[in-house]
Amino acid sequence: MLERATRTIKTAGLLLAAYFVLNIVLRIVLPHSLELDEAEQSFFSQYLLAGYGPQPPFYNWMQYAVVSVTGISIGALIVPKNILLFLSYLFYGLAGRRVLKDEALAAVGMLALITLPQVSYMAQQDLTHTTALLFASSLFLYGFFRTLDRPDMASYLLLGLATGIGLISKYNFALMPVVALIAILPDAEWRRRALDWRMLAAITVALVIVLPHAVWLQGNLAFASSDTLVKMAAGSEPAGAVRIGKGLLAFLVAIIAFAALPVVIFAATFRRDFVRALSAGNRWTGMMERMMLASLAGIALIVLFTGSTTVRERWLDPFLLVLPIYFLAKMQAAGLDLSAGLRRFRPVLPVLMACVLIALGFRVVGAGLIGTYSRPNVPMAGFAREMTRQAEPALVIASDTYIGGNMRLQFPDVPVVIPDFPAPGIPAYAEAKGPVLIVWRGKKTATAADAVMPERFSSALTAAGIALQEIGSLSLPYYFGRQGDNFALGYAWVRPETR
């Protein structure tokens, strides 16, 4: 059965489609309290802007388009994400077919993406912008490999489309076309692909996609880069050898964490064939090696020049995504009979799928057993119900996008704002035609007394001339939580007649 499912990209795609449908069903069955990125998308989907903050806007634009048609719901947040992930696998398989020239092997390579934890588990858990990056990276690999294999206008346009989408998905994607160019320089035939006049069409497509955000970025560069720089520079070490050493060590650990599972699985299933293939190669494996080495060298230089002490595995997504195709191409180049290894490898794939689904479910329903709570465990529906027993809000002012996005899901017909977004201050307050509900978050495991308003939020309300009345706080038990483990929210009402 598994052999039939991996015979072609189409049959493997059907297996993947069923898997992603199960992921959608699982998330809909779990509590509808949102993860951090889900909440951000819920909140930002009220606006169509050229830029939203530290992350590029591709996913926000896609989410805005979906919500504009369907309205806000858990399905409107989850289904598009799973479609993007499905397309990531599909384009990866199509890229693999260009390299491997064997559709059955390409189908296995497509499914082998699930051996990368950053793709299979972390992207499902949250990470909306990383999901967009995975999609763009797979599309880029397909466009790039297709252009190298059999160039035509469609392949160049696809390459430009992928580059444009990638650049407005995650800023680290900017390294991808650079390392791709470096990787083909030693090959005279492939070098001509980069000098082909059709490359101008690819560049034009990419520029058209990027231009609106690039114009916004020009005036908001500090704002857009602040979050990334803070994450990269986290650490208390002064500048110098110790800081550089810590950064390079973090980089090495990230590489190992990213690549360890696929290396172990391929080595365990293909055994000696995997080891023997390490010394084999062809022009495709050489090109992929140069891509990976150039990208890792680029990241190492960034670590050195910025003094970064933090490198996260997901930052390596576009650069090491090619690993499963690379491993299969190496073994194919060695001229080995892979049938025995493939028989051992195929059963691993549904096992990993099941493990991902179980882990995603257990982290929520088993939270009380392990004592660590995820954001879906927070009883947002209960908070919304308790806060609005006496009145329905005409406007919700939230302390941050996490609270704002959850409130938007609970009150889909009510505008939700946070201070200083999308305009300075809270201009929506003056325009509200009814009661205004103000909400802020307390501590994770808390009593109602712990729902103290953040000082920054308090200052923003004061600056906007908002005087709070009817201040309250709530502490409700987590979904699937231990007795006594609560989450706290603070809230206040401002009535029209008292403003």
UniProtKB/Swiss-Prot annotation:
What is the membrane topology listed in the Swiss-Prot or TrEMBL record? Multi-pass membrane protein
Enzyme nomenclature, EC number: 2.4.1.-
GO BP annotations listed? lipopolysaccharide biosynthetic process; lipopolysaccharide core region biosynthetic process
Q: Where is this chain's protein located in or outside the cell? A: Cell inner membrane
Top-tier EC class: transferase
Q: Which Pfam families match?
A: PMT_2
Q: Which GO terms describe its cellular component?
A: plasma membrane
UniProt GO MF annotations? galactosyltransferase activity; hexosyltransferase activity; pentosyltransferase activity
Pathway, per record: Bacterial outer membrane biogenesis; LPS core biosynthesis
Keywords, A to Z, come to: Cell inner membrane, Cell membrane, Glycosyltransferase, Lipopolysaccharide biosynthesis, Membrane, Transferase, Transmembrane, Transmembrane helix
Does the record carry Transport as a key word? no
> Which InterPro entries does the protein's record reference?
LipidA_mod_glycosyltrf_83, RgtA/B/C-like
Explain the consequences of disrupting this gene. Cells lacking this gene produce a normal lipid A structure with GalA at the 4'-position but a modified LPS core structure as this gene deletion results in the complete absence of GalA on both the 4- and 5-positions of the outer Kdo residue and incomplete addition of GalA to the Man residue. The mutant cells are also more susceptible to deoxycholic acid when compared with the parent strain, and more resistant to the polycationic antimicrobial peptide PmxB.
Transmembrane stretches, by residue range?
A: 11-31, 74-94, 103-123, 125-145, 165-185, 199-219, 248-268, 291-311, 316-336, 351-371
Main location (coarse class): membrane
Q: Which family does it belong to?
A: Belongs to the glycosyltransferase 83 family.
Function, as annotated, reads: Involved in the modification of the lipopolysaccharide (LPS) inner core. Catalyzes the transfer of a galacturonic acid (GalA) residue to the 4-position of the outer Kdo (3-deoxy-D-manno-octulosonic acid) residue of the LPS inner core, using dodecaprenyl phosphate-GalA as the donor substrate. GalA addition by RgtA is required for RgtB activity.
Q: What is this protein called?
A: Lipopolysaccharide core galacturonosyltransferase RgtA
What is the protein's species of origin?
Rhizobium johnstonii (strain DSM 114642 / LMG 32736 / 3841)
